Amino acid sequence: MNLNNLGGYEDSNRTLNNSLNYPTQKALSPSLKNMNYQDFLSITEREQPEALASGNTAINTVVSVTGATLSALGVPGASFITNFYLKITGLLWPHNKNIWDEFMTEVETLIEQKIEQYARNKALAELEGLGNNLTIYQQALEDWLNNPDDPATITRVIDRFRILDALFESYMPSFRVAGYEIPLLTVYAQAANLHLALLRDSTLYGDKWGFTQNNIEENYNRQKKHISEYSNHCVKWYNSGLSRLNGSTYEQWINYNRFRREMILMVLDIAAVFPIYDPRMYSMETSTQLTREVYTDPISLSISNPDIGPSFSQMENTAFRTPHLVDYLDELYIYTSKYKAFSHEIQPDLFYWCVHKVSFKKSEQSNLYTTGIYGKTSGYISSGAYSFRGNDIYRTLAAPSVVVYPYTQNYGVEQVEFYGVKGHVHYRGDNKYDLTYDSIDQLPPDGEPIHEKYTHRLCHATAISKSTPDYDNATIPIFSWTHRSAEYYNRIYPNKIKKIPAVKMYKLDDLSTVVKGPGFTGGDLVKRGSNGYIGDIKATVNSPLSQKYRVRVRYATSVSGLFNVFINDEIALQKNFQSTVETIGEGKDLTYGSFGYIEYSTTIQFPNEHPKITLHLNHLSNNSPFYVDSIEFIPVDVNYDEKEKLEKAQKAVNTLFTEGRNALQKYVTDYKVDQVSILVDCISGDLYPNEKRELQNLVKYAKRLSYSRNLLLDPTFDSINSSEENGWYGSNGIVIGNGDFVFKGNYLIFSGTNDTQYPTYLYQKIDESKLKEYSRYKLKGFIESSQDLEAYVIRYDAKHRTLDVSDNLLPDILPENTCGEPNRCAAQQYLDENPSSECSSMQDGILSDSHSFSLNIDTGSINHNENLGIWVLFKISTLEGYAKFGNLEVIEDGPVIGEALARVKRQETKWRNKLAQMTTETQAIYTRAKQALDNLFANAQDSHLKIDVTFAEIAAARKIVQSIREVYMSWLSVVPGVNHPIFTELSGRVQRAFQLYDVRNVVRNGRFLNGLSDWIVTSDVNVQEENGNNVLVLNNWDAQVLRNVKLYQDRGYVLRVTARKIGIGEGYITITDEEGHTDQLRFTACEEIDASNAFISGYITKELEFFPDTEKVHIEIGETEGIFLVESIELFLMEELC
């Protein structure tokens, strides 16, 4: 390359002097004072080690390969692809050089490791074979493209593709031989680039070549696997090589930085474009940007004593910037100082660049940011601003110099010329030293003229200063460069995909940060802060504002949540995203598989030519890191949305049915059918009337199939608690909703309950006649949101889940149509990827954040007489509980086999054994209870009680009846159990006995069922429940309970009382007529209890006969001290004894 050909903007009168301003490697002796300047130059030339060679073949080649690759990304068109192969083969297999050997030699030099000769020769031979076959394939592809219907060209291109693909699969391992992975890495990366480009052709042209769809899919999946494999290999061994060169001295850092710079150019830059070879993700020409920075060598001669120079860590920590948003150089403000020469006869004084600060802008922003000072301004003699505003600096020429003293040297840069596309800028401390340091030796252009073919632009300048009292002084500027593709404007095009790296943001949230990238992304990553806002990007829309775009975001995280895209502060896109990895570390440690894409199904249109795009997160499942790599804009045609809706609906409808459309697929739920129906409803009837009508008919047919396989009656909840249909039975607290954003049909709304004994519930029993023996059935449904919702399916035992589901399906502001109705078409994007039951989490028996749910139940043998059936129950037993759910169904899933069959047989046997035991137990209780009840009644018709039957005896019979188990189902106390008929029979007789008891008792409310009603009491008397009975409680000696009762005079009565005394003293019941005739029953705590007369421990029944002389009598209950409990007071005519 002719370095004097600087393009039209450069100074054609300047002649570049190739003499080197290098010092000797040793401190010069005092004899310097006797030298003249020409003698000094003679010594420096004689003792200077060989300089970095100009025109590095390996680097020159890879920057051209990268340029060619960037221009052919995505699917740029057939001519671009053939020209790409033609250019690449010319670059990598030129006639007069072995470029692959140059690649190996370059890395061998950097890491000082030679490849074993056999491995080297084998790799070179195989590369030669690949080059020959690639040329043949390129010609065959071009011939076929020119004659696509010619069978001969088709056969030839297929043969050449398969041969070349097989060679790549066979030879790639030779480019990663164990022990030589690093020196072979450039070869590996460049070969991988070609293999991925080849595999792209299979997806693009495979159907036209006659490949089967399976063959195309196999090749495509292999390509995706290789993208990941090749990317990870490149990064792994790049990092390994870099860590191998870690050191402690300045010279070691120089080599370390050269390895980093050259391997970025030769390996990582090309690895960054591997994903874009995926022709399904990148289906058109694609524009991407390499935002990584590379650093050219410090502008300095070799320091004579490396031990006194800047240390490795100082260079890395000071010269190398921390990760940051991409910025663009606007101005350098440079200070100049002077080193006085030891002798002007030997050399002139050195006016040198001593300090500077940098002003820069961020992408598409007018704000100017200025750094602090690099260096120390003390002692400077002049300063000035050097503006580069809007001028890409693609090349620098510098004059690194040294002033030599007998025992020390002072290093500095006398002048630098900055060559830009709009002209050049010259910093000149003086003009006595020659421009010998050329940046294009390290960052060459992709051809000539340089101002058109440059590959990098200057973006920043750092500096290292090192001085000690007795040794070398040095102020060393260090330039950093970005790739030319990382342009200032984020241009969005009408005809190609635009991939904007996240580090092109101009503003981040205060807690969001830029972190080091993993190496294969072409730059660094943005890591979210603690809140939802991430940052803002400015874009330039180079297309009509009517143009529509799809959007996707490349990200890595171990959290799930909602990703929002705002345009000009208005919400444009929202979508739920899932974690891409289970655990995640720092950005630099991520692998290719750590990343995924958030793809939005709806399109956007930009409101103006320079929109602000904001990235935002919501509803994160935890605080783990979230990394953003890039956001992509894919142009689509004006009817893309409607076409996508049609294709999406067609695909969705087809996936509902089994082959032949005779039945629904097993995995298809009733909710899914409804959602597909909504997709069909959203199809444009104007653009696709026939297709929409056909799909509507199919989805209606699918809904009928869904109803027909559903074993539940009334799946639309039209007849809850109906006396005409044996379907759903429910409690209060249930509302039937209809037609919202989530549900197309009816759905249930459950509220919480104030009493756990009376939950909000809904249940249904599926009749035995609907079931098959030894079969599995599934209860399925969909929950919009819920808390403490319990779902049961019951046969031999209960399968139970508590369902807590977050209300995270829809945004806070819901889209509505012009009539104020739910706009389901607009809301569909939020429901496209609902979490399924397989993605839910289970903790402490609670199924969380699963909108779709499913519970299994298996049948054993079928017995229509027993009619065990399957019970389905939903309930909420807490005040805080709520639920909104629907699309309930129970469907047959198939026969149970193997372990499941054995398990259900064991369950049935266990259930039958339990049932037999229960039957025996119940029969024994029934016999006892029947006998006890028979003893209460005077006749078989249960129309009269025996006169001597006491309250305690009735209560004792009731206790026996209440000991019967399985009267109601354990999971819901209102559903009759297996012993409910027996219990109902016996309980009816108990109730009849109490009714007859109350009828013959002339003392109303004698069992205190109505509390203190009809009694006159003092304030300290109360009634409390004890063992199913209401008991009158007197706690103090002055407590008093009174009652007046009207009787027949001159008739005999029996006063019978069941009571209990606690503590000292006595309790009493006194009966007195108006003439003062009195009688009394007394109770004490020390009385002997007649077991036959005792119902509950401590309670005693006593009676007396009373013959009133007046119509009215007075009853008084009291005590002398302690506590007195009265269960029942009965007063009845003695004639009842007859």
From Swiss-Prot:
GO terms for molecular function: signaling receptor binding; toxin activity. InterPro entries: Cry1Ac-like_dom-VII, Cry_V, Galactose-bd-like_sf, Pest_crys, Pest_crys_dom-III, Pest_crys_dom_I, Pest_crys_N_sf, Pest_cryst_cen_dom_sf. Gene3D superfamilies: Galactose-binding domain-like, Pesticidal crystal protein, central domain, Pesticidal crystal protein, N-terminal domain. It holds the Pfam family Endotoxin_N. It comes from the Bacteria. Keywords: Sporulation, Toxin, Virulence. GO terms for biological process: sporulation resulting in formation of a cellular spore; symbiont-mediated killing of host cell. Belongs to the delta endotoxin family. Promotes colloidosmotic lysis by binding to the midgut epithelial cells of Coleoptera. Toxic segment of the protein is located in the N-terminus. This is Pesticidal crystal protein Cry7Ab. The lineage of its organism: Bacteria, Bacillati, Bacillota, Bacilli, Bacillales. The gene is cry7Ab.
